[in-house]
Amino acid sequence: MMEPPKPEPELQRFYHRLLRPLSLFPTRTTSPEPQKRPPQEGRILQSFPLAKLTVASLCSQVAKLLAGSGIAAGVPPEARLRLIKVILDELKCSWREPPAELSLSHKNNQKLRKRLEAYVLLSSEQLFLRYLHLLVTMSTPRGVFTESATLTRLAASLARDCTLFLTSPNVYRGLLADFQALLRAEQASGDVDKLHPVCPAGTFKLCPIPWPHSTGFAQVQCSNLNLNYLIQLSRPPEFLNEPGRMDPVKELKSIPRLKRKKPFHWLPSIGKKREIDISSSQMVSLPSYPVAPTSRASPSPFCPELRRGQSMPSLREGWRLADELGLPPLPSRPLTPLVLATESKPELTGLIVAEDLKQLIKKMKLEGTRYPPLDSGLPPLLGVVTRHPAAGHRLEELEKMLRNLQEEEASGQWDPQPPKSFPLHPQPVTITLKLRNEVVVQAAAVRVSDRNFLDSFHIEGAGALYNHLAGELDPKAIEKMDIDNFVGSTTREVYKELMSHVSSDHLHFDQGPLVEPAADKDWSTFLSSAFLRQEKQPQIINPELVGLYSQRANTLQSNTKKMPSLPSLQATKSWEKWSNKASLMNSWKTTLSVDDYFKYLTNHETDFLHVIFQMHEEEVPVEIVAPARESLEIQHPPPLLEDEEPDFVPGEWDWNTVLEHRLGAGKTPHLGEPHKILSLQKHLEQLWSVLEVPDKDQVDMTIKYSSKARLRQLPSLVNAWERALKPIQLREALLARLEWFEGQASNPNRFFKKTNLSSSHFLEENQVRSHLHRKLNLMESSLVSLLEEIELIFGEPVIFKGRPYLDKMKSDKVEMLYWLQQQRRVRHLVSALKDPHQSTLFRSSAASL
């Protein structure tokens, strides 16, 4: 008989038991659903006020929680109390209870308060455990800072983190936003799984540093905290569970088939060590899941055979949650799902701890051999600097020297003074030379003194090119060898001589006179515009060539003599010169030839450097013969006696001297007859009128020369002034002509006016101006010396219109041009006032002036 079929639930349990090891997710225990409260109970709760989160209640709860956390850590009690005090002080100073949210119900407000309380407790514990871990890891024997300094730094950092994660306004805003999101997800069906955090719960609680730890406790937060992580960690338990998984049978069917047509060819040179390095580098690159390998098995020896290909990498390798918590590993995945019963394997916790201890001891041995322990009690930082292995050789030498000195001092043979060496005899330095006829000679330097050098030195000399003592080379060969140096020295001498004639003060503009005198030559005759109205004449570059041909020389000399020197002679008729035009052209064509030119080049020097640098022979300058002038000898007045000389004060008249002369009995006048005094007075008045002397100066001269002592000097003064009067009148006449000419020719606006004048009009103006200036310069040279001599002899200058004429000569030309320009401006202003329509035009022209 056939057995009855088994019920379907038994088969499902059997298949589940077989496929459970193949699942990638651990089993989930279903939590019992909380019983729903009746709506009446919620209405009753709304009538009660919300429980307040006071500072005292929070501090008491946090203190109780932290007192039992991290007990396994090897930390002094003072350090634990210090960290707990920092957290409690931050809560006491900065905690503010948030108000009730109007948008939430009474029940939701209570949940929010519980959520906030849970967040504060959880965050305080996380911060406390993290800084306990940092205190343990940083307080090492080889640390640079002391334990107290390390604790102070960690306390300051903990206070900052407490401000960020406990009492900051961002904490409550983040909690409220997350709480409202959970409420919306709870109302919507199937959205609870979407709020699951990106990383699994408890990931950030674990330490990413590979085990074994020296802290003494397992669950320690040593990575950087995050506000979002702490907010997600404070969610209710139902939101922290993993999402529902698929049915194992459906999960098994969804696995795709493997493609084994293209197997992976593993190279034989890749060992297990290479795989471990690659896996460790991949794990370091993941910031959210820092893991480390847990397999402690010894590496297998290298096998040259090809390794088998794997369908997928093992996801169980690396640092896992079970390794952190010290739990036994999960059962290994079987090769076939047909496993009727699971084998129980012994726990490997003890083996892992033993291997950790072995590796710790091994590391301590390696560190001890690499860095020897310090014998002195110096701080670690100073010990590292002074006990570096590179300074070991120097320390050994110093210790050896110290031992020798101690031995000598103990034996009594130690002498504070070093042993004196015997004086050396002076020896000259000799050099051995071998001459051409194989004669060896020792040449010694001249010994200046008997001093000896304790430090000897040696200089290797280069071999000699030739020996002049043996006569290996004749003077001609030596001169040929030194021809390059000779040419260079000659060139330097030439340039030195040339540059000595170049002025080095050509850029010093302040050394010359402010006003350059006019040229003595008439440069207008040498301009190209001077030949516009004349026939074209051959230009002579080198006048020495003229002497080769008499006919051409005579012709050119006659032309140069006929050349006018003044612009008035340039307008003369040129019909007389046209008669010799035919003879000039014939001589010009027939006399010049190439042979004559080359003959001239061979007979004369072609170096023009002396012309460029002005090194030609100095020519005697042609002096312009000045017009005959009278001798400058002035009759000196009779000297004054000390008792006769009165004290003259300008503007004051000593009438005693006049009465003394007129009322004195039996006294004769100083000048003889009275008519001479009258004639002298008449001459003086004429001089005053011509020179336009002001009344004040006339009165001063009258007072000065009315005394009997000065009256004898008056005739000499009048004669001297009469001699200076004529040149002054001539100069004033020339200056008046120049003023009239500049009134017409110095207007700057004449260049912008349209006139019918030719282009040579401005050249003629320049010629007239230079002619007048030249005459003034010739006259001023003699007049200045005459006026200076008069002022030197008589002690007072010649006055013209109230000014000393010497001072007037220095600036009257510039003043003349200035007042001419001012007169033009006045005329423009007057014309602008008379014609208001053209006032704008005259304003622009006046501004340009």
UniProtKB/Swiss-Prot annotation:
Similarity-based family: Belongs to the CCDC87 family.
InterPro entries hit by this protein: CCDC87
PANTHER family noted in UniProt: COILED-COIL DOMAIN-CONTAINING PROTEIN 87 (PTHR16078:SF1)
Designated gene of the protein: CCDC87
UniProt KW NADP keyword: no
Superkingdom as given in the UniProt entry: Eukaryota
Name this polypeptide is given: Coiled-coil domain-containing protein 87
Coiled coil: 387-415
Function comment: Plays a role in spermatogenesis, where it is important for normal sperm head morphology. Also required for the acrosome reaction and thus normal male fertility.
Organism: Homo sapiens
Alphabetical keyword list: Coiled coil, Differentiation, Fertilization, Spermatogenesis
GO BP annotations listed: cell differentiation; positive regulation of acrosome reaction; positive regulation of fertilization; single fertilization; spermatogenesis
